[in-house]
């Protein structure tokens, strides 16, 4: 992962001020903020931050680990539940805000930079796939095979919309893949081979991935095909695809931060401007996007935006040569017989 980035000086000062404020309490009575802070540090919890200096916590719960962003609803609920269980009192909002800010700063100052990823990660030559189930099970893949584990060295972060993948079958074959092909009405005979290549590319880490472009007439089932293909590697609970009336570079970057696989529905040739085309290529080739660092006015960080991408529409979408070179383009036909 390389040498961790140097923390902005103002964050270091903020940490000192926050710690001093929390510890400057009356000797005879602890504040609720200090009480909550002490409760947190009594738990089996590890703090760190990602390449954007966003703070994360890795919490040991029962026989597995869960990773929360400190600015997420999951960590909010974790702190409220912890305080309720230990004190049988309601956690005041001001106390939560104060302690959360302290912990976020603590994570960036005292924690280590971590490889925080969604769905797929790599560590020391081993690949890891987050199944996103309630047991927080992960598939560990090596050159010798694969196994299910709950103790991944990779910090897997989840969004609320990520759905679970099934437990892999050691005795499985390609029958399910062939069955998938039977639901997809693509024109070319080698379409399933190309889709298989795209699916395999979706599991790559720190590498370029092809963009899957699905084109066809209205009613051909482009949206359904996109959802089915995405569901093999990165199923969603509700947000199976993204449809925006106006696409911008910033909206693409935000989408990439929150999803491992991006499906853009009902694109038109006019949607893919030169700027958007360049950004799609940046995402497909795992290049970096520059953005302002948290809590600073001038510092910037480079965010890796390597993502798996599917776009669909009626028009010829990949007209610019750089986007065309990075795309698998498939034509889909309207189904001759509807499945009901």
Specify the residue positions occupied by each region the protein language model found.
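N-terminal nucleic-acid engagement/recognition segments and initiation subdomains in replication
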Residues: 1-171, 254-255
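P-loop NTPase catalytic core of nucleic-acid-dependent motor ATPases
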Residues: 61, 145-258
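Conserved RecA-like P-loop NTPase ATPase core
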Residues: 67, 199, 229, 263-265, ...
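Conserved catalytic network of the ASCE P-loop NTPase/AAA+ motor domain
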Residues: 204-206, 253-257, 272-274, 300-305, ...
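Conserved catalytic/switch belt of AAA+ P-loop NTPases
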Residues: 234, 277-300
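Loop/turn-to-beta-strand initiation segments
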Residues: 258-261, 288-290, 304-309
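Conserved AAA+/SF3 P-loop NTPase catalytic/coupling segment centered on the Walker-B
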Residues: 261-284, 314-325
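Phosphate-sensing "switch" segment of ASCE/P-loop ATPases
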Residues: 301-307, 316, 321-340
């Amino acid at each position: 992962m390389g040498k961790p980035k140097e923390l902005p000086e103002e964050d270091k000062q903020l940490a000192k001020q926050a710690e001093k404020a929390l510890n400057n309490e009356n000797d005879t009575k602890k504040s609720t903020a200090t009480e909550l802070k002490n409760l947190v540090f009594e738990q089996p919890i590890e703090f760190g931050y990602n390449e954007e200096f966003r703070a994360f916590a890795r919490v040991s719960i029962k026989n597995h680990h869960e990773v929360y962003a400190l600015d997420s609803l999951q960590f909010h609920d974790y702190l409220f539940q912890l305080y309720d269980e230990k004190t049988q009192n309601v956690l005041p909002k001001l106390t939560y805000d104060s302690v959360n800010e302290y912990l976020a700063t603590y994570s960036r100052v005292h924690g280590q930079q971590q490889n925080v990823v969604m769905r797929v990660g790599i560590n020391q030559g081993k690949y890891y796939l987050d199944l996103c189930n309630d047991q927080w099970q992960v598939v560990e893949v090596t050159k010798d095979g694969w196994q299910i584990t709950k103790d991944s060295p990779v910090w897997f972060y989840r969004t609320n919309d990520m759905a679970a993948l099934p437990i892999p079958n050691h005795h499985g074959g390609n029958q399910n893949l062939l069955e998938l092909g039977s639901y997809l009405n693509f024109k070319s005979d080698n379409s399933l081979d190309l889709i298989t290549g795209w699916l395999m590319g979706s599991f790559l880490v720190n590498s370029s991935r092809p963009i899957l472009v699905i084109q066809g007439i209205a009613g051909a089932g482009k949206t359904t095909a996109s959802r089915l293909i995405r569901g093999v590697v990165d199923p969603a609970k509700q947000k199976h695809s993204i449809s925006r009336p106006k696409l911008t570079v910033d909206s693409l970057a935000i989408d990439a931060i929150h999803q491992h696989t991006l499906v853009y529905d009902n694109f038109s040739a006019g949607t893919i401007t030169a700027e958007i085309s360049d950004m799609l290529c940046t995402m497909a080739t795992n290049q970096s996007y520059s953005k302002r660092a948290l809590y600073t006015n001038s510092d910037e960080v480079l965010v890796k935006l390597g993502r798996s991408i599917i776009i669909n529409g009626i028009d010829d979408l990949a007209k610019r040569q750089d986007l065309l070179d990075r795309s698998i383009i498939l034509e889909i036909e309207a189904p001759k017989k509807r499945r009901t």
